[in-house]
Amino acid sequence: MNELQILLVSGKPLFITIDGFRQAMLTVFPSNGKIVEDKSDIKVVCGFSQAEVDAYLKEHTWYQFETHVALEEIKKVLAQDNDTSTVTLTDEFDDEQLPDNSIAYHRVWGIVTADSNWWFSSKQLAADLQAAEANPQISCHFLHINSPGGEAWYLDRLSETLCACQKPILTFYEQMCCSAGYYIGCHGNRIYALTDNDYVGCIGTMCSFYDFEPYFEKLGIKRVEAKATNSDLKNKTFDDLRHGKDEKFVHDILDPLNVQFLAEVRSQRSQLAELPDDAPVLRGETFYTPQAVELGLTDGSHTMQEAIAEAVTMGREYIDANKLKTAIYNIV
């Protein structure tokens, strides 16, 4: 089983929409029973030869390669627009040979996992943010999100990294920026959707999994379990949940994660901080762009080119502000 399959059947708390969970289950456990584990047989991808793909994958994860391919396609679009044709959008965050005012491209696509080679990784994003922060040629972070959410674990550490960034962050999402996706995206100094029909929100915490034991029993597969005399509480909370008694699991596990989630989005979005606890937006509701703007979840809609151009402006303002600080310090 790959990392995403293991996560989905683990019973771990997830920041994800119901539809996102179903989509993920169908993706990694397809109804035809054919699960493709090995992606290395791709001959040519968007102009990359097999040798180039192999060389890239020696130092990068598969997800980073997918991001690199996506970035190359975005660059082609930017090159056709006068306002963005000279912009340097990069995923090589350590490269100090980049032009001044380069923009770091961070892609948050699909299910959020903490640590994965095939899928988006919260740990990898944290490392990428730190690398881009340390590179003087990079002036702004561009978060490109299309995610229904995912794994809750490690998001608190990723949030710390995002909050510690000195360089501005622009969040740009398309289709959906939900649950764990919004946990990440809310750290943008500005947040934009691609269209009026993009989904955003689903701020909340849930756990969802399938109980296969009755099915296994029909196949004659019986689960046997024994606990030491003084280990009566071992896995009890989870077992109670599986048998329909969810009170302790909700109180001890889901509720604390949810408090953390709500505190984070309220600290990043001032309009959300002013809302009462029982506001629908803080109880897991999801919204299209126009209503999301009214609620303060997002700041409007932009084309990709407009969002990139604004990121360039934010980066330039950051550089100018730093130059002014340096000049003042030199005078003092």
Outline where the language-model segments fall.
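N-terminal organellar transit peptides
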Residues: 1-197, 203-332
